Amino acid sequence: MSKKDTVTKAFMRENTVFADAFNYLIFNGKKVIQPERLQELDTTELVQLIAKGKNNKNESVQKYRDILKAAVIMEDENADYLLLGIENQTEIHYAMPVRNMIYDALQYGNQVAAIAAQNVKEKKAPTRAEFLSGFYKADKLRPVITLVLHFGADPWDGATSLHEMMDFPLEEMRTFIQDYKIHLIDPAALEPDELEKFSTSLREVLGCIKYSKDKEKLSSFIRNNTRMMLEINAARVIQAITNITLDLSEEVEEVVMCKAIDDMMQDSREEGKAEGRTEGILFALTGLVRDGVLSIKDAAFRANMTESAFEAAMKKI
């Protein structure tokens, strides 16, 4: 597992951040899912494919999710139970709809197998049809929602549905082929008002990723944000994804982002000055070559460049 994968997984595993992501996705930022009502589950999706007949053996299918939690959502005095999974993507996965569909199908398969085993244990009297499936008419599954969180500055350009991964020779076929859509949070696609719907440091993480390729916009986002004292896990994600240098020493529990931005902007100014000096030297040497005072070989030597690189630079001046 890469460093980016490790730090994003540790960050999103925190119940407060996990709940924040799903409250944005499902409830438009309203705090309905409570962190204290989340329970982490085994991320191994293992299901036994039950074979029919005496000589056929059961086969196992196994996959590993990033994060899976059980959630209890209280509405009035009623409790709704569901399973929530997050897939962290530091790179775009062009088969994500199929991947998520497999995870969800295996989870439902797990639930069917567990319910069937419980029915046998309780020695319930089934009908013939219920006996064959092990899953009784009155049994219910818990809903599963899987969220893809893209930790990248470039816009997600992969498919977001199974249908997008297919060609339909006959348009009439589309209606009869089941679609599967992914739920995606993509920093590049988030508008400023949407970032405000996040209530934890997930907002700062997504914002820093969104603006990471534009130093001026990144500086503005951080300076206009009142919550730029970030916990260490959030800061680790920002540094790993955006390459902003932060003080992540072990004794530090919170990181001040404004200082990092000041340092970044100062480095940018120094780089600009250095580039300006280099351009000035190249301009002068090019003039001397064109006036016949220096050979290309001598000018390239003075510029600490190869002759071919110097000739290429001359063409741009």
Sequence positions of predicted segments:
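Elongated, amphipathic alpha-helical interaction scaffolds
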Residues: M1-I317
